[in-house]
Amino acid sequence: MCETPIGCHTPRRCNRFIDSAALIDCTNKTNQREHSPSFSIEIPTTPSRKRTLASSHFQTPTKRIKYELGELQEEKTDLYPNFPAQLKENKKPKLPTTPQTPKTPKRTIQIVTPKSLNRTCNPVPFATRLLQSTPHRQLFPPTPSTPSTPSYNSTAKLSLRKSYRSAGVVGRENEKSIVESFFRQHLDANAGGALYVSGAPGTGKTVLLHNVLDHVVSDYPKVNVCYINCMTINEPKAIFEKIHSKIVKEEILENEDHHINFQCELESHFTQSANELYNPVIIVLDEMDHLIAREQQVLYTLFEWPSRPTSRLILVGIANALDMTDRFLPRLRTKHITPKLLSFTPYTAQEISTIIKARLKTAATTSEKNNPFTPIKSISEVSDDSINVVSQHADETPFIHPAAIELCARKVAASSGDLRKALDICRHAIELAEREWKAQHDNTLSSVDIPRASIAHVVRATSAMSQSASARLKNLGLQQKAILCTLVVCEKTSLSVADVFEKYSSLCLRDRLIYPLTSSEFCDVANSLETLAIIRLRTKQRNGKPQDRIISLLVPEMDVITAVGDIGTLKRFFDRR
């Protein structure tokens, strides 16, 4: 058996032996250990470059620099014992460095902007800061505005708004008695119950419920009333969290199934055995049809709670659909827990006329008490003829001619019976009459010569309300179009009036082409847009502030963009910056 001796090596392994003497010594020791004869085969290989230890470590530029700096001597003496002694003792002299030309110091000039002496460090509120402009960039000086005195017709226009709550309900006496008896019957018996109120839009459902609840709360102070508009809820399951926050008012840790936790907490609260532990609860869910889902489990749960034996929950649902319980909730009839149904029919022409006249007379009484225009006369200056004139005018309908009210009521009753539309027409007619009066006279109104809206004003207001959206947008003013452009830029459906005013002010001050309105002027312009059925203003709570009302567009966004297409000032509202 022939073994390859260690001396026989391949070209790749030959580099492992640094010294030839070490290679011969290793071969001799192997031959002495093995007594059998051996021979070696020499294979021609490529001769490798001979590298000396000193040159291999000091000929490269990098390591030469290390040697010059004196660092290599300390690093290599421990690794290589045979390091030359001369290199340990002697150091090469440092190479002379090229002298550098000294740099001339540059001259720096510091520019300091002078500070204004009138600058104060007091914090400015954000709403005030929006309406302030930079002095050196102001394109036009703000014109000082004279405080405007509220007109005599402002009370009348306020009474014709949709959010106005009158002292009594006109034209719904039968429905009011049914709702009052329902509440009193269940509150006296300490039992739960369910009521479903249906009817077309503008038939007085929400107004009547608010009026009845005010009397119920005054007669039963311990009752807890919870009113929720379901249009403010993103998904049907979120109704449990909304009710829990208003009734139980206890915090629950949120997790993936936090809606189920709120539901279980409410169910245990409404169905506990000891009825004395909690007061009766009345829950009013306006726009209840927004809770309709695929399986309707949320609605079934809500209507099942009042039917429990120990429940003291009174549930009232309000929606437009007349047959919502029969079409979407058929299992309620199977379980014999069908709620009490109450349907509101559309208003007749006589009812609409009666409601408008009652509101205008109430507004006239309020205006006479707070009227700043009526001059105070002494008793000697008042004649018998003036007393007869005052008594004669007291019997007439103020602000609008009775024939004009009848015309408006008949037109609305023939089309839809929506009271809100009739109120908008009458308010717009008063604005038209007031505008004509100010154009012809010295821009003042007096209680002696109040311009009553005539039939011509009602006809013009009706035609303006019945126009297409594009035609109505075309006739708007610059500030009205600016507010609509702001709504399009916001790209959200649930914004309050305060949020839209903040965005509107920032857009006007960004381009400095339109001077923004004040907060009160902004609300007036928004109310005029609501009169033209271009936007919708609705309150989130019963006693909400005007700035907290939710504002939304009733016309397509493309119609707004088309209406402002030829106005370059408003086009910049859509620029992204």
From Swiss-Prot:
SUPFAM superfamilies in the cross-refs: P-loop containing nucleoside triphosphate hydrolases, Winged helix' DNA-binding domain
Effect of residue 98 to A: Enhanced rereplication in orc2 mutant lacking four cdc2 phosphorylation sites
GO molecular function per UniProt: ATP binding; ATP hydrolysis activity; DNA replication origin binding
Classification via Pfam families: AAA_16, AAA_lid_10, Cdc6_C
Stretch list, region Disordered: 30-57, 84-107, 136-155
GO cellular component: chromatin; nuclear pre-replicative complex; nuclear replication fork; nucleus
GO BP term (any one): DNA replication initiation
Compositional bias per record (Polar residues), positions renumbered to this chain: 37-57
Keyword Cell division set for record: yes
Keyword 4Fe-4S listed: no
Gene3D superfamilies to which the protein is assigned, alphabetical: 1.10.8.60, P-loop containing nucleotide triphosphate hydrolases, Winged helix-like DNA-binding domain superfamily/Winged helix DNA-binding domain
Keywords noted in UniProt: ATP-binding, Cell cycle, Cell division, DNA replication, Mitosis, Nucleotide-binding, Ubl conjugation
CDD domains: AAA, Cdc6_C
Binding site for ATP: 199-206
Signal peptide positions on this chain: none
Post-translational modification: Ubiquitinated by pop1 and pop2 and targeted to the 26S proteasome for degradation.
Function as written in the Swiss-Prot or TrEMBL entry: Part of the checkpoint control that prevents mitosis from occurring until S phase is completed. Plays a key role in coupling S phase to start and mitosis. Acts at the initiation of DNA replication and plays a major role in controlling the onset of S-phase. Together with orc1, involved in the maintenance of replication forks and activation of cds1-dependent S-phase checkpoint. Together with orc2, plays a role in preventing DNA rereplication and resulting genetic instability.
Assembly with partners or alone: Interacts with the origin recognition complex (ORC) and is recruited to the ars1 origin of replication. Interacts with cdt1, pop1 and pop2.
Family note: Belongs to the CDC6/cdc18 family.
Name of the featured protein: Cell division control protein 18
